[in-house]
């Protein structure tokens, strides 16, 4: 049973909530620095801002303008949206509209869901944000629902059921509105669920289509699951895609196959660990590219897909770029899926290289052993990946991607076959992720994580700045020559985009696992990010640097101190 609370501010100085966010507004989002209308700050997900008021020379004067309590002790991974003087922010249990200049709450809509929902959430109770379109704010709800709210009042317009926790599903990602369709994905590969992407009518909430990411017998791709197509699982779609409105193509990443053990699912296991190009009106898959066929390592390929125009091979291309969890950075022609570049950007021993003629990885000898389920191996990157869901940014001025990357390996040990036979791999069962024993390998004395400035066509880092713990936050790059990101020890930092030098830092009192954004209001540039992390006992044992970081969610907004 859901409950809705509307809290109205009593001041007469609140901004007027405009009825905007047309398809044209969303298409032009990258060119409207006074707004943040989409996840990724534009359809391209470059997370680049043309604003320069906050720059290398002025950032030392950056101070908090206000902070808003999210009244939550879970992970605050949400990205704020900003329109006409209002910030819209989500947590797992609420959506709020806030005055950008004062931090005062305009309205708040609460959400409730059954306690058992947490049983099918793999890696934390969180929400990553929403979408704006035609006077509505769209979001997903953890227990498998999609919701539309009135942006003026916070009142619910529609609320529809997509999936159930009994089937092993959860929903944590921000929706994408493309060509008038609200598009969402699901989590659940660790619970043997079958991934899908869905499109909804923005006005009514009626489901328009569903595209499954793993086939059933007789469907295209079923031949890549020999003897297993009837039970194929995985391919979760738990982050948010990008959109090229000129090509009318949505690009969405898919997760790992289930179970982790690859012995009984020989074959490529399409369309897991892939990038899919989809028509938003119909859900038709136009092309796909798979990064990790027959994946035994949990290398979810759901990382942000960045759209840009770059020179590759002496020619200008409309490309998509992805720093993947498996340690390779892929550049594809987004018109047809042709692979243009694939290079390691982090330590990756599971594959020697990517064969550019076939587009397939050349497996290492160690990977072949684990695929045959015969003996333990050491492998890089670890199960969390060279990066994870937290989005990178790209500057068209420097031509570099700014990526938070982990520097951790893993020892894999296959479970005995007799134990595998006892596992229940039915949808909704946790065993989907428990068929291989893992032990992390930490570098000593090297940093466990880096912020890297990477040439996307070569994978080479112009610079890298080390951190004791891997950062779990998104990055933001600006024309002011700065990269903003957060640390798990609670600092928001500003880094020189050309050198990697940390120029400014601020302690927010809880770990930052959110996504910084910037915009301007009445001639003043602001930076906003969520703060709030929750670490389980295992995480605290493995990383003493985050063992004592407090919990507690907040939304922080900064501006320059007047001279």
What are these regions (language model features)?
Residues 68-82, 92-134, 164, 287, ...:
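Blade-loop segments of beta-propeller domains
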Residues 309, 407, 437-501:
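Loop/turn-rich, solvent-exposed surfaces of beta-rich toroidal or solenoidal domains
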Residues 100, 105, 128-162, 167-213, ...:
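Hydrophobic or amphipathic alpha-helical targeting/insertion segments
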Residues 516-563:
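Blade-level signature of beta-propeller repeat domains, shared across WD40, Kelch, NHL, RCC1
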Residues 36-40, 73-92, 119-145, 170-194, ...:
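Repeat-blade elements of multi-bladed beta-propeller folds
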Residues 21-70, 104-119, 155-164, 206-214, ...:
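Aromatic (tryptophan-biased) beta-strands that constitute blades/sheets of beta-rich domains
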Residues 149, 195-207, 268-284, 329-337, ...:
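Beta-propeller blade signature
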Residues 16-20:
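Sec/Tat signal peptide C-region and signal peptidase I cleavage site
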């Amino acid at each position: 049973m859901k409950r809705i609370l509307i809290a109205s501010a009593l001041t007469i100085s609140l901004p007027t909530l405009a009825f905007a966010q047309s398809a044209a507004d969303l298409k032009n989002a990258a060119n409207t620095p006074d707004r943040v209308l989409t996840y990724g700050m534009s359809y391209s997900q470059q997370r680049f801002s043309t604003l320069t008021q906050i720059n290398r020379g002025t950032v030392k004067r950056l101070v908090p303008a206000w902070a808003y309590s999210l009244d939550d002790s879970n992970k605050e991974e949400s990205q704020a949206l900003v329109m006409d003087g209002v910030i819209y922010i989500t947590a797992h249990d609420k959506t709020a509209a806030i005055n950008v200049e004062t931090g005062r709450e305009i309205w708040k809509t609460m959400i409730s869901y059954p306690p058992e929902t947490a049983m099918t959430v793999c890696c934390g109770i969180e929400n990553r944000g929403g979408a704006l379109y035609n006077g509505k704010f769209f979001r997903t709800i953890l227990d498998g629902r999609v919701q539309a709210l009135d942006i003026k009042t916070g009142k619910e317009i529609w609320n529809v059921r997509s999936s159930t926790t009994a089937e092993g599903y959860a929903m944590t990602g921000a929706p994408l509105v493309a060509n008038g369709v609200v598009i969402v994905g699901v989590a659940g590969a660790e619970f043997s669920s079958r991934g899908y992407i869905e499109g909804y009518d923005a006005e009514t909430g009626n489901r328009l289509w569903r595209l499954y990411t793993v086939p059933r017998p007789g469907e295209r791709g079923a031949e890549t699951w020999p003897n297993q197509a009837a039970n194929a699982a995985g391919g979760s779609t738990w982050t948010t895609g990008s959109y090229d409105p000129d090509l009318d193509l949505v690009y969405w990443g898919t997760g790992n196959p289930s179970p982790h053990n690859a012995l009984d699912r020989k074959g490529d296991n399409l369309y897991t660990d892939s990038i899919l190009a989809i028509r938003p009106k119909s859900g038709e898959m136009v092309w796909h590219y798979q990064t990790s066929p027959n994946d035994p390592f949990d290398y979810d390929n759901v990382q942000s897909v960045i759209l840009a125009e770059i020179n590759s091979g002496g020619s200008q291309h409309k490309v998509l770029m992805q720093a993947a969890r498996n340690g390779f950075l892929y550049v594809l022609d987004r018109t047809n899926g042709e692979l243009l570049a694939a290079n390691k950007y982090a330590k990756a021993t599971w594959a020697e290289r990517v064969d550019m003629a076939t587009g397939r990885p050349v497996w290492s000898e160690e990977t072949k052993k684990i695929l045959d389920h015969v003996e333990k191996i050491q492998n890089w990157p670890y199960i969390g990946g060279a990066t994870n869901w937290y989005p990178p940014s790209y500057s068209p001025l420097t031509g570099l991607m700014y990526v938070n990357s982990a520097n951790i390996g893993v020892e894999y040990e296959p479970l005995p076959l007799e134990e595998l036979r006892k596992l229940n791999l039915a949808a909704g069962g946790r065993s989907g992720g428990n068929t291989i024993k893992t032990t992390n390998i930490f570098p000593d004395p090297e940093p466990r994580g880096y912020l890297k400035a990477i040439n996307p066509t070569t994978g080479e880092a112009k610079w890298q700045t080390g951190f004791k713990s891997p950062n779990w936050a998104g990055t933001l790059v600006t024309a002011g020559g700065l990269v903003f990101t957060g640390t798990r020890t609670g600092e928001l930092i500003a880094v020189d985009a050309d050198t990697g030098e940390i120029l400014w830092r601020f302690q927010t009192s809880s770990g930052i696992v959110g996504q910084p954004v910037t915009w301007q209001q009445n001639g003043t540039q602001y930076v906003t990010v969520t703060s709030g992390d929750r670490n389980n006992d295992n995480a605290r044992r493995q990383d003493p640097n985050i063992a004592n970081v407090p919990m507690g969610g907040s939304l922080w907004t900064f501006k320059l101190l007047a001279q």
